[in-house]
Amino acid sequence: DPLLEYSXEAMEISYTAPNSSTYEPPQIRNNQLIDTILNELLNVQTNYTMGLVNLLQNFIIPLRIQVLSTGIGSDMTRINQVFPPTIDEITRINCILHDSLNKVSRYGYVEIIRVVGMILPYFYKAFIRHEANLKLYTTRLNKFYSKNSKTIFSNNLINKGNYSTREIDSIVSGSLLELPKFKLILKRLHDAIESEKLKKKNFENFVDNETSIITYYYNTAIEVIDAFGGCQGSEDRKIDSQLRVFTPTGKILTELATKWPPELQYGWLSRKVVGIYELRNVKPKSFFDLEILIIFSDHLLFLTIIEESYYIRKKNEPIKSLSVSDILMHSLVNEKPLPVLSLLPSMEVNSWCNLNEVITSCYLGVSSHTSSKQDFLRFLNVSKSGFKSXXLDHLIFTKNYEILRSKENKYLSGHKIIELINKAKVLYKNQLFHLFRSTDSKITYLLNCS
């Protein structure tokens, strides 16, 4: 299970505090309300960070060490199901933000908002993975406690912090409330700053030279939080009720893209989402070359991003922005409504096929965009009709894609995607089969179904 593997997101940016020659102090100083809100923001973030750090140091890590010393791999798997590595992921990114906020706290509200806007996008992937692990978490934790009360929870060498199940649940599950709390505090901070500036403009010659910076990083932070919480805005696209496609949870899938294939309107009682990736089409039919690959347990679906502003924004973005694939993964896996649709570019279904009709291979090539070597994927459709498409003018049997080397998936390999496609094929089976793994590490899996 990919959710039970530690998969921290690489960060290519880090906050650098201003030096004395370039630093410009905030235009509003010694304001009690603003200072109080800033202190609240720092205290809330510190409390969440220290709660997670202490739980890891005083319970989870000693427990893992104890289990690893026994040499029984199945025991570690069971431990990871109750204390998943996503706890480590959200602790890591909280520590990074905590360290940056400590460095910047003396510089005032402009730099604090800048830090939050720069680092909060890296919270998104860690938190959606963590939320996916928390389904029925309290039940799993209580069951684990009932079986290991004396050997683990009453063992002072393991439970150094003397944690109860209620405290553990509060820290692990309660961590998801951090982002909504951030939003409330950031909104109060932003409103307080704007209110004080308005007063200055009314009673003195006041030239505002920091609003553009504050607004940019504030909006970036709020967009991340809204995307995580599934905040619905007033920009929802109006969809013909006859064209809507619903999953069992009531999700309207035609919000994702236009030209949704009719054959995917059915089968949602057993269909699962295995993975979602953003790729670049090697031979696009138009300027729009970025596509979203959705790996279902029974189909592969390719969505083309057809919004020109998205390509411009992607090229010129100064800091990390939310990945379309991550937003969709959060919505489909964690059963959350789609966020404000301005976060999602316009998309349309390019093509689709049955999962068992495709052979996927990986090869190394040179990117025409970066001039560097990276992985490419080749999808070969072995059916007589090839890939299906809403605007099919000729048969297509092969599709080639470049795996984007970006801040979001710099270390993603083609073999990882192939492995997930093979796992999806296993999920799709409804009869007995044999599973073989090659001794050659270059070959991921071989399937022989009976």
Curated annotation (Swiss-Prot):
It comes from the Eukaryota. GO terms for molecular function: guanyl-nucleotide exchange factor activity. InterPro entries: DBL_dom_sf, DH_dom. Keywords: Cell cycle. The keyword Cell cycle applies. Belongs to the BUD3 family. Co-assembles with BUD4 at bud sites. BUD4 and BUD3 may cooperate to recognize a spatial landmark (the neck filaments) during mitosis and they subsequently become a landmark for establishing the axial budding pattern in G1. This is Bud site selection protein 3. It comes from Schwanniomyces occidentalis (Yeast). The gene is BUD3.
